[in-house]
A protein has these predicted regions:
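Positively charged, helix-rich recognition surfaces that bind polyanionic ligands
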Residues: 1-154
Length: 154
């Protein structure tokens, strides 16, 4: 998670790691519980730091190519074990309960750009990808609000 101000400046970053959930034989129910609790902690952290808008990757836009996400067995297992729809729905519900405005952002290219920016920003790849998602969301909001103002004057 990256917390940005209205100008797109990073104010804070927070990452939750739990690599064990992708291990072969790790119980799916326990993995789900770990993911959802981590998401709750991140949203609580954002709430108590004055965040009002949350941008989530629109995970439904991530498509698999030929039934595979990547070319490695380990990567394919991780992708197939990841309950993206469930996590997104739960995240949206929890964010709305906390009073956040919620927007979904097309994640296309965010990981690649995040990887490229990570060295310059001195952040890990996940935090820099979250930064890119935040910038895309802020750009959408600024563009959308600008077009709404134009509509009011017509």
């Amino acid at each position: 998670m990256a917390i940005l101000d209205g100008d797109g400046i990073i104010r804070d970053v927070r990452v939750e790691h739990f690599p064990e959930v992708n291990s072969p034989g790790f119980p799916k129910s326990k993995a789900k519980d770990l993911r959802l609790k981590a998401l709750s902690r991140l949203l609580d952290y954002a709430y108590y730091h004055g965040v009002s808008v949350v941008f989530f990757e629109d995970l439904s836009m991530i498509k698999r190519k030929g039934g595979k996400v990547v070319r490695s067995k380990k990567g394919n297992r991780k992708a197939s074990n990841f309950a993206k729809k469930e996590l997104l729905e739960h995240g949206i519900t929890m964010a709305l309960k906390r009073g956040f405005e919620v927007f979904l952002v097309n994640p296309t290219g965010s990981s690649k750009l995040g990887r490229e920016l990570s060295r310059g920003l001195d952040l890990d790849i996940h935090s820099s990808s979250a930064f890119v998602i935040g910038l895309l969301g802020l750009n959408y909001l600024k563009t959308h609000k600008h077009s709404q103002k134009e509509e009011q004057f017509r």
